[in-house]
UniProtKB/Swiss-Prot annotation:
Catalytic activity, EC: 7.1.2.2
Native organism: Clostridioides difficile (strain 630) (Peptoclostridium difficile)
Listed name of the protein: ATP synthase subunit alpha
Gene (UniProt): atpA
Record's function text: Produces ATP from ADP in the presence of a proton gradient across the membrane. The alpha chain is a regulatory subunit.
Pfam families referenced in this protein's UniProt entry, alphabetically: ATP-synt_ab, ATP-synt_ab_C, ATP-synt_ab_N
UniProt keyword terms in alphabetical order: ATP synthesis, ATP-binding, Cell membrane, CF(1), Hydrogen ion transport, Ion transport, Membrane, Nucleotide-binding, Translocase, Transport
InterPro entries membership: ATP_synth_asu-like_sf, ATP_synth_asu_C, ATP_synth_asu_C_sf, ATP_synth_F1_a_nt-bd_dom, ATP_synth_F1_asu, ATPase_a/bsu_AS, ATPase_F1/V1/A1_a/bsu_N, ATPase_F1/V1/A1_a/bsu_N_sf
Alphabetized GO MF terms: ADP binding; ATP binding; proton-transporting ATP synthase activity, rotational mechanism
Length: 500
């Protein structure tokens, strides 16, 4: 092989000419210790709180403890591949998730990555998981109703768009059923729903997704899932990721309903992380800032002013109590942050009153101004009659000889309890709710036996819809409907066949 010196020199000159010296400057650190989803990283002097850190093998972490020489980071994923001495890079970005229309109908994890096997998500925008809540000037008071389709809630504990309403109760009292029914009831109402599952079983989430699919609700719903088998940091970050996805729609003038199921598990995950990061424990071993954990999340739900597009984000956080103890640390924290609570009582649930809403200690602090006129008219009387019945029922257990008035009130109360019962995944239109509540408070059901009431109710809806559709229009339009509805109920009662 004959090599000419001039050829070699021309090749070398060409190489030198084309050489570009690219120097990439990144702030790096090295792993000192790792375990239980927590890494101590030496270096990274300029790291920000909440910054995304890159570990080897495309594993990411989040800087939480910023000390003089060491950064305490939580690992968002599997920490088994990370070892002592590994190089950690700063990304210069706060943890962010994909947002926008592309996520609707999908099931994603806490970082917005798809886990439903339907391929990648074609998103064009991301948002930081932590962002500042709208200020006082940016908000307007809640005035539009958000119908749940559940009679006891829409009448006595109404929810408005932009409200935060806590759902609280022991395990297995129907908390998730209420929020699923609320999501199903948003069909055709131009509301985007986000369901954030924290610390739940995968089988439960699979069941829930199939319920939403059957009801056609997945077309306007995003499911964010951080299951019980995932690390504490992913369970901690899931609600903030869901809120970021919702904010994108809210700031674009749309209406969002977001469910956090449930925040007690998020608090437990945060406690685990904080103790591993050696933060000082407080009451029930929770860190001192556990109130701020939930307040900064729930303050992001708002009804925006018209100048900002008038969008809204309604939050339904769920808290699980132990043996009905609503005065524990986390329940009292969240009760004080939210605009009211729906308390589900195990005794009611087991006695067959489902949904097991206890109107005695349930309250909606701002929802009353969001009720439609017709519902406001009938709901006040209903709540009063129901609470009087509860009092009388407890008292009448001790007395055998009751006067006629007391017997009448007890009979009416029994019928109120009966009409407030509702099957799972069977939301009822607000105009139909008004009809049956009007019937019971005006004693139109006093001669109908208790075991016939459910049938009477469903047949009444069909009768009015088929023969007097204008009544529904009047109820929704805020016109006077009482005479027409009374006549329709009386006509229907004549045709109704009581089954013994």
């Amino acid at each position: 092989m004959n090599l000419k010196p001039e050829e070699i020199s021309s090749i070398i000159k060409q190489q030198i000419k084309n050489y570009e010296n690219k120097v990439e400057l990144t702030d790096t650190g090295s792993v000192l210790t790792v375990g239980d989803g927590i890494a101590s990283v030496y270096g990274l002097e300029k790291a920000m709180s909440g910054e995304l850190l890159e570990f080897p093998g495309e594993i990411y972490g989040m800087a939480l403890n910023l000390e003089e020489e060491v950064v305490g980071a939580v690992i968002l994923g599997d920490d088994s591949e990370i070892k002592e001495g590994d190089i950690v890079k700063r990304t210069g970005r706060i943890v962010e998730v994909p947002v926008g229309e592309a996520l609707i109908g999908r099931v994603v994890n806490s970082l917005g990555q798809p886990i439903d096997g339907k391929g990648p998500i074609a998103y064009t925008k991301t948002r930081p998981v932590e962002s500042e809540a709208p200020g006082i000037i940016d908000r307007r008071s809640v005035y539009e109703p958000l119908q749940t389709g559940i009679k006891s809630i829409d009448s006595m504990i109404p929810i408005g768009r932009g409200q935060r309403e806590l759902i609280i109760g022991d395990r297995q009292t129907g908390k998730t059923s209420i929020v699923i029914d609320t999501i199903l009831n948003q069909k055709g109402k131009d509301v985007i729903c986000i369901y954030v599952a924290i610390g739940q079983k995968r089988s439960t989430i699979a069941q829930l997704v199939s319920s939403l699919e059957k009801g056609g609700a997945l077309d306007y719903t995003i499911v964010v899932s951080a299951t019980a088998s995932e690390s504490a940091p992913l369970q901690y970050i899931a609600p903030y990721a869901g809120a970021a996805m919702g904010e994108e729609f809210m700031y674009n003038g749309k209406h969002v309903l977001i469910v956090y199921d449930d925040l007690s598990k998020q608090a437990v995950a945060y406690r685990e992380m904080s103790l591993l990061l050696r933060r000082p424990p407080g009451r029930e071993a929770y860190p001192g800032d556990v109130f701020y954990l939930h307040s900064r999340l729930l303050e992001r739900a708002a009804k925006l002013s018209d100048e900002l597009g008038g969008g809204s984000m309604t939050a339904l956080p769920i808290i699980e109590t132990q043996a009905g103890d609503v005065s524990a640390y986390i329940p009292t924290n969240v009760i004080s942050i939210t605009d009211g609570q729906i308390y589900l009582q195990p005794e009611l649930f087991y006695s067959g009153v489902r949904p097991a809403v206890d109107p005695g200690i349930s309250v909606s602090r701002v929802g009353g101004s969001a009720q439609i006129k017709a519902m406001k008219k009938v709901a006040g009387t209903l709540k009063l009659a129901y609470s009087q019945y509860r009092e009388l029922a407890a008292f009448s257990q001790f007395g055998s000889d009751l006067d006629e008035d007391t017997k009448k009130r007890l009979a009416q109360g029994e019928r109120i309890v009966e009409i407030l019962k509702q099957g799972e995944h069977q939301p009822i239109k607000v105009e139909n709710q008004v009809m049956i509540i009007y019937a019971v408070i005006n004693n139109h059901l006093e001669d109908i036996p208790i075991d016939n009431i459910a049938r009477f109710e469903s047949e009444l809806y069909a009768f009015v819809d088929n023969n007097y559709p204008e009544i529904s229009r009047k109820i929704l339009g805020g016109e006077d409907f009482t005479h027409d509805l009374t006549d329709a109920i009386n006509e229907f009662k004549e045709k109704f066949v009581v089954e013994v």
